[in-house]
């Protein structure tokens, strides 16, 4: 399949755009990456996703698919015979992967993002408490899902790995910005080892943003709160 048949509208710094990029790499699907300029929305984006007007959007034979996790599922279904399965085959495991993916987006990432916006010490303490609780939940989820293997999905990166792993670059940037170890090996050893394995995977490394570059970008969109 030619890359012109598959296009992805996105931006290099977006963790949500990383999700379909990793999925496409896992499935060895060539694609054209159409980068949006931060702070503006192209006509193609507005036309392709008129409801939410957000990235990412996958264009497959000019048909748009929106929302990062939905795109990942679409990629897994469409190229089911290529590469490892992204979603678990067992219905219960599949349901659990979707449950934790929703938790990550609705709770865990909200807390992580709040760290960069937090002003006073009390606000930071509240965010730390939320993240530590979330990390403990995810540590147990990893142990339950991985069954002793390197990834949530077992031997290969899967749906839940992508859902959480896409935020690791932003997690590193946040740790530098607030001088606090969010993913602590002493508290979450299994999750910390998983993060190392995930970042070193050949499907992930080419699309993982460089920490220094992402840190500079973060300064533009998350100015330090005024004292």
From Swiss-Prot:
Stated family = Belongs to the GST superfamily. Tau family.
Q: What is its EC number?
A: 2.5.1.18
Q: What is the lineage of its organism?
A: Eukaryota, Viridiplantae, Streptophyta, Embryophyta, Tracheophyta
Q: What is this protein called?
A: Glutathione S-transferase U17
Which Gene3D superfamilies did the record assign?
A: 1.20.1050.10, Glutaredoxin
Q: Which InterPro entries match?
A: Glutathione-S-Trfase_C-like, Glutathione-S-Trfase_C_sf, Glutathione_S-Trfase, Glutathione_S-Trfase_N, GST_C, GST_C_Tau, Omega/Tau-like, Thioredoxin-like_sf
- Look up the record and give one Gene Ontology term from the biological process aspect: toxin catabolic process
Q: Which residues form the signal peptide?
A: none
């Amino acid at each position: 399949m030619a890359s012109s048949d598959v296009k992805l509208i996105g931006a290099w710094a977006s963790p949500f755009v990383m999700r379909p990029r990793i999925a496409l790499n896992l499935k060895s699907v060539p694609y054209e990456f159409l980068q949006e300029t931060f702070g503006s929305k192209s006509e193609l984006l507005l036309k392709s996703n008129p409801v939410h007007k957000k990235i990412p959007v996958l264009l497959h034979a000019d048909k748009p698919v929106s929302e990062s996790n939905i795109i990942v599922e679409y990629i897994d279904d469409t190229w089911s015979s290529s590469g490892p399965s992204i979603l678990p085959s067992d219905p219960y495991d599949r349901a659990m992967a979707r449950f934790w993916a929703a938790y990550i987006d609705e709770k865990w990432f909200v807390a992580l993002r709040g760290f960069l916006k937090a002003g006073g010490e009390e606000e930071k303490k509240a965010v730390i408490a939320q993240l530590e609780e979330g990390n403990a939940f995810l540590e147990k989820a990893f142990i339950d899902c991985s069954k002793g293997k390197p990834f949530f999905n077992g031997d290969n990166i899967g749906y839940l790995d992508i859902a959480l792993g896409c935020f690791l670059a932003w997690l590193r940037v946040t740790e530098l910005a607030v001088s606090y170890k969010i993913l602590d090996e002493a508290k979450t050893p299994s999750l910390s080892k998983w993060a190392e394995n995930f970042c070193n995977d050949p499907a992930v490394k080419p699309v993982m943003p460089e920490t220094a570059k992402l840190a500079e970008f973060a300064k533009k969109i998350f100015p330090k709160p005024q004292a």
